[in-house]
Amino acid sequence: MSEINKAEIVASNARAPSDTGSPEVQVALLTARINHLMPHFKTHMKDHHGRRGLLRMVSRRRKLLDYLKSRDADRYTSLIQKLGLRK
């Protein structure tokens, strides 16, 4: 994932112009990294060390989403819809 791509993700999910640490931005960046890694794991199914890192990212995203849901349900639902995480 390139720096330009990261900057676009931050800009599209930031609550303020200089916002880089809000849960929305963190979840969006983790989602982009997870989506970027998925083709690798479809090809290299036995990469268990890499899969452990992927599962850590998924777990961290889940914790951030739980935090956001407990703090502000409206922001949570809008983020879920924007990123397409729930069907």
Curated annotation (Swiss-Prot):
UniProt cross-references to PROSITE patterns, sorted A to Z: RIBOSOMAL_S15
Example of a GO cellular component annotation carried by this entry: cytosolic small ribosomal subunit
Annotated GO biological process: translation
Protein keywords: Ribonucleoprotein, Ribosomal protein, RNA-binding, rRNA-binding
Disordered: annotated span: 1-22
InterPro entries registered for this protein in UniProt: Ribosomal_uS15, Ribosomal_uS15_bac-type, uS15_NS1_RNA-bd_sf
One Pfam family it belongs to: Ribosomal_S15
UniProt-recorded Gene Ontology molecular function terms: rRNA binding; structural constituent of ribosome
Keyword match Ribosomal protein: yes
Family membership: Belongs to the universal ribosomal protein uS15 family.
Biological role stated in the UniProt entry: One of the primary rRNA binding proteins, it binds directly to 16S rRNA where it helps nucleate assembly of the platform of the 30S subunit by binding and bridging several RNA helices of the 16S rRNA. Forms an intersubunit bridge (bridge B4) with the 23S rRNA of the 50S subunit in the ribosome.
Oligomeric and partner information: Part of the 30S ribosomal subunit. Forms a bridge to the 50S subunit in the 70S ribosome, contacting the 23S rRNA.
PANTHER family: RIBOSOMAL PROTEIN S15, BACTERIAL AND ORGANELLAR, SMALL RIBOSOMAL SUBUNIT PROTEIN US15M
Protein name: Small ribosomal subunit protein uS15
Naturally occurring in which organism (per UniProt): Leptothrix cholodnii (strain ATCC 51168 / LMG 8142 / SP-6)
